[in-house]
């Protein structure tokens, strides 16, 4: 039955729950003297069996999906989640983000692309790589 269900209803429902949860922690102390929201950005690769998940090829005999997460450190609530195939490079996620003015983005060097980081700067946000 799940194969025929549209996955977008679950994505929309998840976003509604995330929005409610972030409101609950909006006033929580972060432990840092920063006025803006602090986000951590990273991804994880989930290995899958290629014979069971042929739609997610990663290597010759392996399948994988990547979960890219933008985590609001106040409350440790995901603010943005994107699923991709395992081959999709992390830096591409910066093209999907809508930068928040005054926010701080902490990310590893997989997101190091000067044009994309400059777009964060132009939006009035800050980043640490």
Regions found by a protein language model. Name each.
Residues 1-129:
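Conserved, well-structured functional cores that handle cations and Mg-NTP chemistry
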């Amino acid at each position: 039955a799940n194969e025929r269900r549209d996955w977008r209803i679950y994505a929309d429902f998840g976003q509604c729950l995330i929005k409610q949860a972030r409101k609950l922690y909006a006033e929580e102390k972060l432990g840092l003297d920063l006025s803006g929201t602090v986000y951590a950005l990273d991804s994880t690769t989930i290995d899958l069996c290629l014979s069971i998940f042929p739609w997610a090829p990663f290597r010759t005999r392996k399948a994988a999906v990547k979960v890219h997460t933008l985590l609001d450190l106040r409350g440790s609530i995901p603010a943005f989640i994107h699923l991709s195939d395992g081959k999709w490079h992390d830096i591409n996620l910066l093209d999907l983000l809508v930068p928040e003015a005054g926010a701080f983005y902490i990310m590893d060097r997989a997101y190091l692309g000067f044009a994309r980081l400059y777009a964060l700067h132009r939006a009035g946000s800050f980043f640490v790589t």
